[in-house]
A protein has these predicted regions:
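Short acidic-hydrophobic, aromatic-tinged amphipathic segments that line or gate anion-handling sites
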Residues: 92, 159-171
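Acidic, Mg2+-coordinating phosphoryl-transfer loop and its flanking beta/alpha structural elements
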Residues: 119-164
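Short, acidic loop-to-helix structural element flanking the phosphoryl-transfer center
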Residues: 36-64, 71-78
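Short, charged, surface-exposed secondary-structure boundary motifs
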Residues: 99-105, 151-158, 172
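Substrate-recognition "cap/lid" segment bordering the active-site pocket of phosphatases
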Residues: 71-124, 128-135
Length: 181
């Protein structure tokens, strides 16, 4: 798109406008294209994700998937999750990045205030822009899924632990669980 080709490993910033050196209008076009249903449905699963999440659900843990995707991407995102055997996991879209410009009162859309009213003891995050949001949850352990765009980011505090894949995420979860029993 726009004649720009940046390999995945070279995506240095979560802010794609900065990574690809885009104009405001190019960035808006990219964000729209990236959230078209056909594009969302074609994303590959990160190895081990559905297996690990389903393991936690099978163990009786309450699991939610909370994304900063636009509110109108809920249906294709829900469909993708269902196709990847995550139909038991509720999905919520939260305006984490201030991109939503109109109020939508769907049960699966949350404001930041609604999100902060929830309680979590474990989170998995890869967006440096969202680290601040998960910092609100007292006592929450945060597994930071290493990505090229977050690897250079300083972690906010010792509740944040870097993980290379879902096996490491699950180990961090198991250690947290062992400490709680």
């Amino acid at each position: 798109m726009f004649g720009i080709d940046v390999p995945y490993r070279e995506v240095q910033f979560f802010n794609l406008k900065k990574t690809f050196d885009l104009t405001d209008s190019q960035y808006e076009e990219l964000m729209k294209a990236g959230h078209f249903p056909d594009n969302l449905l074609n994303y590959e699963e990160t190895p081990g994700a559905s297996e690990t999440i389903n393991k936690w659900v099978d163990m009786g843990h309450e699991v939610f998937i909370i994304t900063g995707r636009p509110f109108n991407s809920y249906e294709p995102s829900r469909h993708w999750l269902d196709e990847h055997k995550l139909e038991r996991v509720p999905l919520y879209c939260v305006d984490k990045y201030g991109r939503e410009n109109c109020k939508q009162d769907y049960v699966y859309n949350l404001t930041l205030e609604q999100l902060y009213g929830m309680s979590f003891d474990f989170a998995v995050e890869d967006s440096p822009a969202a680290f601040w949001h998960v910092s609100h949850f007292e006592g929450c352990r945060i597994a930071v899924f290493n990505r090229p765009w977050n690897i250079r980011e300083e972690l906010p505090d010792d509740r944040f632990i870097r993980c290379e894949g879902w096996k490491e995420v699950d180990k961090v979860f198991e250690i947290k669980e062992a400490m709680n029993t």
